[in-house]
Amino acid sequence: MTSDDKPATHLFDQKRATYYEDRIRQVVPGYDALHDLSLLMFNREIGNAGHFLIAGCGSGSELSSLSRQSPDRTFNAFDPSSDMIDMARARVETENISNSIVFSTGTIDNILSNQKFDAATLMLVLHFIVDDESTKGKTHLLRGISDRLKPGAPLIFAEALADRATPHFDSDMNLWRQHLLLKGMNPTDEAKGFKKIVSQMALINEDRLNELLKQSGFTPAQNFYRAHMIHGWITRKV
């Protein structure tokens, strides 16, 4: 059940949800494989139970995947976008997910710091967070997640990694653009949207990623997935 007894189906726009699900698969190579492997990693790490923190829950893909095999898993899911929370709630209802789920519209600061979770996810979020020490920065988010995990608890996250200073950055970006078109994105949408998306991404390299994890109380990241620039990682609370 969700934290809101009010039915979410009236909020569920099937066309909008389908558009989002199609678009994310165009943008992220191997999107479904990423979630399948994340599920298997969690099964290996903590078994079929546990209390999960879903940071930046989006349309609810992680909730759908992680609840699939076990009704004993419970979740706290947050996202700063109320539209995404609405979509996630609707997905939970339409898929008849019976796990206990608490939704929050907001940031990591809306999750009580005295809660201690068995595991967390941060999927395709970090590359949109600025790399600074502000409350809107990567470090603040990672520290906030770390503070709410039990010692040794795993965090599985995925993000685009790249170094804008490398000579092959532009060719990597072009390959990504070609993938969007190959997967059926309208050329007009691609031309208008791609440059905007890339300009909004606070891309970092792997060295900087591990530096941020260390500062935030995590172990060095172990890579378990890669499709072009999209990487899947597991790290653990120290």
Where in this protein do the model-derived segments appear?
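Conserved alpha-helix/loop element of class I SAM-dependent methyltransferases that forms part
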Residues: 30-49
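N-terminal, positively charged/glycine-rich alpha-helical extensions of SAM-dependent methyltransferases
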Residues: 1-19, 176
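A short, conserved alpha-helix within the catalytic core of class I
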Residues: 129-144
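Class I SAM-dependent methyltransferase SAM/SAH-binding core
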Residues: 51-55, 59-110
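C-terminal alpha-helical "lid/dimerization" subdomain adjacent to the S-adenosyl-L-methionine
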Residues: 158-216
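A conserved beta-strand element that flanks and buttresses the S-adenosyl-L-methionine
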Residues: 121
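Short glycine-dipeptide loop
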Residues: 149-155
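Core SAM-dependent methyltransferase catalytic element
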Residues: 216-238
